[in-house]
Amino acid sequence: MKLLIDIGNSRVKWARSEPGRYTFGGAFATDASSLAEACESQMAALPRPEAVLVSNVAGMRAGRLLADWASARWVVPVRFVRSEASALGVVNAYPNPAQLGVDRWLGLIGAWRTRRDACCIVSAGTALTIDLLDAEGRHRGGVIGPGLAMMRAALASLEALGGAAESCDGFFCNRTGPALSSGILHSAVGLIRESQARAARLLATEPELLLTGGDAETLRPYLETPVRLVPHLVLEGLHAVAERMP
């Protein structure tokens, strides 16, 4: 068994990787002050893994704390996965492959593992990232925008003037709070739709839309094309990397 850990900006997710399958284990908030305690609470009872594979976008401190905890708990190698020029059938579009966020890289690998065809991968988390993968496994690049929470934080001063953001039944709203919510939501939806349209023109086919991340369920009802929810796409990619290891 190998232990897979995805350290995101907001959440840490983990899973067990075994030949032919992986099992989601749980999640907790990315908080460096209590990271070791959260790991101990959720993972201490696991049998000793052969190795620990980590995707980390939350900074060096979080990664170091996790590695120190895992090494002390089991005395096992801790491997931090890095973006590569190509791996497992996927070709990185970035001239400097290491500059592509490892979460996006593993999302591409996870998507290719589950569906070997063109797809548009939307990760709706702290940031909203959209990456295009063609039918040959080539990454065509991506776009990055603010996530829903980031937009709310940026508009906090307007909320103070007009009340806290709240849902709006339609697109146009007659109070500041709902108008903010509508604008935030449809800014994200608009970027996804524009990305889909441009992807279809570039590839001359309609790529499947894969949706992952903490805000995936919020955005899904507003997307007009068929959507496939993939809750733990980074862990899917980590599992593929784990299976490649000797």
Curated annotation (Swiss-Prot):
One of its GO terms (cellular component) is cytoplasm. It comes from the Bacteria. Homodimer. CDD domains: ASKHA_NBD_PanK-III (cd24015). Its EC number is 2.7.1.33. InterPro entries: ATPase_NBD, Type_III_PanK. The keyword Cytoplasm applies. Catalyzes the phosphorylation of pantothenate (Pan), the first step in CoA biosynthesis. It comes from Methylococcus capsulatus (strain ATCC 33009 / NCIMB 11132 / Bath). One of its GO terms (molecular function) is ATP binding. The active site is at D103. This is Type III pantothenate kinase. It is found in: Cytoplasm.
